[in-house]
Amino acid sequence: MAPSVDSEVIGSFRRLAREPLPYAPDLVVEKWRSTASGLTVLWAQFDNPLLNAYITVASEIFTDSGVPHTLEHLVFLGSQQYPYKGVLDSLANRAFAQGTNAWTANDHTAYTLTTAGSDGFLRMLPVYCDHVFFPTLTDAGFVTEVYHINGKLEDAGVVYSEMQGR
């Protein structure tokens, strides 16, 4: 079946396509794009107590500097509206979420959100998006999360330690 396009509009989002999955024809996926920001959203609705979101941003670089992985970690340390470490984890606990997580691939970084029920999901999503799109990038965050030399004069930092384990 060819995707249908009816250009329904909700707020600043316009539906671009609506198509059933070939391997699950009862599951229809919709593609929406914000006319304000260009943000693209893929949406599938089905009966399930868990809600999932994958906030995926392009992060391809052509060096092995580790900048996307570093940024992935720094995002969780705060945002412009919520400039405190741990805000997302506190919200996740109250939303019956499975915590916060992310991964970095060759060309993108994906931030995940899974909650039980829509109430917590709808409370968490704007805060999570603020962290992803407007992170506080501080020297202190870099020293704590990425790289520093500890009191024993050893290389340390969460990102540094992760990369040493590979």
Language-model region placement:
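N- or domain-start disorder-to-order transition segments that initiate the globular core
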Residues: 2-48
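A structural signal for the main folded, soluble domain(s) of proteins
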Residues: 4-12, 24-29, 60, 65, ...
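M16/MPP (pitrilysin/insulinase) zinc-metallopeptidase core fold and M16-derived inactive scaffolds
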Residues: 45-124
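M16/insulysin-pitrilysin zinc metalloprotease superfamily fold
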Residues: 78, 113-151
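Secretory-pathway/luminal and periplasmic proteins that interact with or process carbohydrate-rich
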Residues: 81, 98-102, 134-139, 165
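Residues that form generic nucleotide/phosphate-binding pockets
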Residues: 91, 131, 162, 166
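Hydrophobic, small-residue-rich alpha-helical packing segments that form membrane-like cores
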Residues: 145-166
